[in-house]
């Protein structure tokens, strides 16, 4: 019989302090990625994405090995894992809160709910609105990204994950990613690791209500788990409703002492109002309101931006996922085979300038991972390899947005994509203190688009800019063919070094290449719309002006060379721990998705040369038996390099400094209190010309939890304690106006409470 346990952020050599508000807050802020990375495919644990995940003993590694810290220390790059026990206890759990303790991962909330926050790591995918590329997002080691690399971030639900793996930069190459940003892997719980049942009810301000739960069972040779999460909210702003339903199940089987298998399935349904941006002055006066579009008087235009009240932008999306993972261990050889299929529906009602985009299609994924570990005492496999192939197709239809209703079709496309990624790498020990890790990755991608619209013209509509509720005569423009066939190939070599002068400290350095092809969203964009007219109609009052409704830029793949170095360690007593990484990237052909002063799409372009410099710093400390804290600091200086138009300006949308800190007090055995702050102390550029900026802000939250019994606890929190008015994010444009609607207000002060019961 194999014993199974939850992979926990504890080890015999690194004590942890049980903190109920933040969960188990390890003295090392980032508990070994390895605890999940290299153990996750063990039959008793969930599905890590990393190869070699079962190279360690299949008995209880987390309890018997005592070297979990060493697993993390061996990695020559930025990586972390956040267990569900480490999430802040919250009535409104979001990705930004779940990952608040991880430096280098910048999450900017858009509308406060389960919608489309901007997630960027090291600036990859930074300038998409919304961000839909730049990071490989995985569920149990299989991508929720579509075959072209795009993803819907709202499907990522931290409440449905037992842990989240974070691989920053090239450390994600072993997973099949070659992008600059890296990868996030949401790992499901299993019946072996989490037997019994759990139920969490929560609610609070802005109509927030939710219920989540799971039930798991584990026997000697098999296990199973079912989970669900339902949430909804009215939202902070006037037009701000959102809801999400997620369900999932997995079944594991110990076929033999050498073979384990797991089958899993999940479904997510997401819907949210797009409350849209506000001009800064309007946001400061009343952040709850939504915008009614530009003011036009005597031929002049003030406050350019979308008319949210009339157009009622919204997104409704669903995704079904089914997959399997099979692991075979033959002495020092480990083989891992994964197969997956996703079917995605996405109905995105943009403002009139882009119309309604409906996309529906499926994607198949196949992954083969191999690890060779002849030395059982080694932490990492001597050799590891991954091959991943994703292929998919989708139908895409474009319709006019007529005051929030679906109008005539003006575009129809059949989209196909395929991506092959291959990775191979060594971890070569040079004595007891030094490891050299050379690796090579290759990626080949195909993007095909067949324009099947079939009509000679594309319809257009418009409204009177001076009275935007009054429709103008309909029009039509010639239907230019938008078909294309593009292919991209690139190599991504890397070389990493680690040096361990003591058992508690590690220094590392690495140089790597990254390669990121454009997605269909980059290659096919609606253009020539305005806040009062549809694509192809740049002048609302002139329906006869011939202008293309789509742009299909011939884009190059984005590539970069990155050097990074870091130092992580802890004091001998374990009261202080740190993890710091600095990196510099020379980026070529950075993919930028541009918008004009009204927020209308201009399509994607390649920047010539850009530079990304950053520092990722995490620290954790235990001051007394009852007081502890942690800090996650991210510095980002992303700039154009000798650009003929933008010079050496900062890339819009990237906060230069982001500090997230938390303090925890264990007031008694059953009662804990905590406080946290999210502080952006510097202005953030809204446009690439650096003429408009979002102001600095600080948001303070308070939390508390009380354990009524061993199985029941209650919790409460106050978010944005001082009711600050601030922009949690912005639109990103190339050239802004001072009065432009570009600012997305963060939630005001809110109160949440909940009850958690285990059975």
Residue positions per predicted region:
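Transmembrane beta-barrel wall of Gram-negative outer-membrane proteins
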Residues: 196, 203-232, 237-285, 312-334, ...
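Solvent-exposed loop segments that connect transmembrane elements
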Residues: 275-308, 397-410, 447-485, 521-553, ...
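Membrane-embedded beta-barrel scaffold of Gram-negative outer-membrane proteins
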Residues: 221-222, 336-340, 346-347, 500, ...
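Extracytoplasmic beta-strand/coil segments of soluble accessory domains associated
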Residues: 96-142
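Short acidic/polar hinge/loop motifs at secondary-structure boundaries
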Residues: 126, 135, 142-169
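C-terminal beta-signal and adjacent terminal beta-strands/loops
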Residues: 4, 515, 679-686, 705-759
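N-terminal periplasmic "start-of-domain" segments of outer-membrane beta-barrel proteins
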Residues: 57-90, 116-120, 135
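Gram-negative outer-membrane beta-barrel transporters
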Residues: 370-371, 432, 436, 444, ...
């Amino acid at each position: 019989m194999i014993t199974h346990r939850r992979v926990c952020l504890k080890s015999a050599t690194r004590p942890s302090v049980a903190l109920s508000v933040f969960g188990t807050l390890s003295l090392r802020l980032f508990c070994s990625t390895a605890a999940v990375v290299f153990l996750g495919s063990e039959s008793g644990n969930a599905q890590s994405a990393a190869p070699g995940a079962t190279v360690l003993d299949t008995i209880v590694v987390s309890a018997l090995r005592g070297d979990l810290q060493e697993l993390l220390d061996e990695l020559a790059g930025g990586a972390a894992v956040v267990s569900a026990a480490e999430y802040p206890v919250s009535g409104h759990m979001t990705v930004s809160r779940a990952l608040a303790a991880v430096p280098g991962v910048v999450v900017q909330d858009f509308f406060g709910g389960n919608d489309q926050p901007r997630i960027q790591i090291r600036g990859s995918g930074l300038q998409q609105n919304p961000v839909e590329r730049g990071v490989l997002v995985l569920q149990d080691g299989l991508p929720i990204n579509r075959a072209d690399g795009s993803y819907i971030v709202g499907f990522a639900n931290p409440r449905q994950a037992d842990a989240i793996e974070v691989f920053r930069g090239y450390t994600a190459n072993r997973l099949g990613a070659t992008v600059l940003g890296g990868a996030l892997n949401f790992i499901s719980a299993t019946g072996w690791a989490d037997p019994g049942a759990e139920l969490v009810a929560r609610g609070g301000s802005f109509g927030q209500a939710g219920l989540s739960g799971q039930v798991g069972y584990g026997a000697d040779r098999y296990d199973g788990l079912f989970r669900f999460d339902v949430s909804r909210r009215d939202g902070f702003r006037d037009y701000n409703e959102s809801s999400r339903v997620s369900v999932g199940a997995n079944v594991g089987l110990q076929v033999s002492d050498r073979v384990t298998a797991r089958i899993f399935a999940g479904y997510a349904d997401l819907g949210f109002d797009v409350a849209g941006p506000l001009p800064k002055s309007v946001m400061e006066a009343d952040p709850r309101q939504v915008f009614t579009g530009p003011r036009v008087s005597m031929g002049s235009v003030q406050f350019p931006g979308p008319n949210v009240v009339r157009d009622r932008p919204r997104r409704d999306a669903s995704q079904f996922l089914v997959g399997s993972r099979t692991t075979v261990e033959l002495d020092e050889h480990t083989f891992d085979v994964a197969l997956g299929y996703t079917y995605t529906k996405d109905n995105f009602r943009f403002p009139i300038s882009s119309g309604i985009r409906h996309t529906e299609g499926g994607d198949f994924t196949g992954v083969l991972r191999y690890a060779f570990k002849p030395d059982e005492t080694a932490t990492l496999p001597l050799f590891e390899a991954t091959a991943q192939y994703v292929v998919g197709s989708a139908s895409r239809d474009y319709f006019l947005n007529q005051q929030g209703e679906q109008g005539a079709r003006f575009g129809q496309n059949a989209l196909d994509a395929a991506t092959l990624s291959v990775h191979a790498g060594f971890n070569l020990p040079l004595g007891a203190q030094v490891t050299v890790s050379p690796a090579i990755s290759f990626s080949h991608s195909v993007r095909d688009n067949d324009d099947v619209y079939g009509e000679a013209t594309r319809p257009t509509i418009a409204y009177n800019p001076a009275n935007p509720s009054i429709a103008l005569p309909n029009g039509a423009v010639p239907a230019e063919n938008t078909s294309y066939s593009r292919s991209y190939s690139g190599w991504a070599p890397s070389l990493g070094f680690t040096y361990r002068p003591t058992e508690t400290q590690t220094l590392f350095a690495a140089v790597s290449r990254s390669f990121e092809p454009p997605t269909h969203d980059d290659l096919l964009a609606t253009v020539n719309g305005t806040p009062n007219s549809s694509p192809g109609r740049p002048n609302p009052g002139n329906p006869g002006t011939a202008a293309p409704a789509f742009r299909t830029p011939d884009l190059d793949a984005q590539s970069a060379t990155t050097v990074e170095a870091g130092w992580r360690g802890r004091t001998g007593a374990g009261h202080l721990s740190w993890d710091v990484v600095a990196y510099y990237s020379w980026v070529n052909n950075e993919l930028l998705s541009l918008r004009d002063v009204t927020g209308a799409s201009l399509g994607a372009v390649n920047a010539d040369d850009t530079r990304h410099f950053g520092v990722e710093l995490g620290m954790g400390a235990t001051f007394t038996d009852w007081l502890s804290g942690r800090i996650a600091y991210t510095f980002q200086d992303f700039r154009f390099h000798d650009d003929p138009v933008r010079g050496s300006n900062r890339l819009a949308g990237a906060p230069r400094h982001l500090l997230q800190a938390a303090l925890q007090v264990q007031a008694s055995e059953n009662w804990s209190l905590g406080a946290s702050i999210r502080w952006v102390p510097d202005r953030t550029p809204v446009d690439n010309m650096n003429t408009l900026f979002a102001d600095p802000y600080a948001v303070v939250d308070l939390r508390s939890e009380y354990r009524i019994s061993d199985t029941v606890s209650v919790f409460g929190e106050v978010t944005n304690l001082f009711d600050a008015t601030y922009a949690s994010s912005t639109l990103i444009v190339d050239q802004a106006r001072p009065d432009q609607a570009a600012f997305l207000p963060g939630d005001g002060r809110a109160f949440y409470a909940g009850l958690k019961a285990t059975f």
